[in-house]
Amino acid sequence: PMTDDTARHNEKMAKKKAARDKIMATKSGEKGLIVVHTGKGKGKSSAAFGMIFRCIAWDMPCAVVQFIKGGMESGEKKLITEKFADICPFYAMGEGFTWETQDRARDIEMAEAAWEKAKELIRDTRNKMVLLDEINIALRYEYLDIDAVIAFLKDEKPPMTHVVLTGRNAHEKLLDIADLA
């Protein structure tokens, strides 16, 4: 039997559904997102690797480029390189955090090489997602030109490719173009 509470609830939910349907009608459908994981706490790379593992689980080609942590071992790197390298190539391009290397010219060279690899992987439309792990550090220390990175993401990222960028202190310009941050 329909009670007054049930009727009110149904009416309220019908209004919510109509409002939600109106919002969803304005959405342009699926597209590849630019996602920035930044902040002071831990978990930025872990969250991004969760997204990569989801791609792997659904047999969606993806790729990882590590900008800074290249010399460091991690469970994510071990699992991907040993078990899923065919669907998710993993490029550890850095040599460690800059305060460990203390060689700015070498850090810039490594960051530029990582960025070239990243662009190649992003342009490859087979990749549904590309993770640029710790790129925000490379941008913060000006190892890469923020305007060049922004221009590439805006102008050359294929429409259905997701690009995930991690690291503390994300540049304001990067946050401005992000779909999720």
Region locations from a protein language model:
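Generic detector of well-ordered alpha-helical packing
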Residues: 67, 134-135
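Conserved P-loop
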Residues: 33-123
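Extreme N-terminal, non-catalytic leader segments
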Residues: 2-33
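Generic hydrophobic/packing signal
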Residues: 38, 52-56, 84, 128, ...
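Short gly/ser/thr-rich secondary-structure transition/capping motifs
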Residues: 17-20, 112-116, 163-167
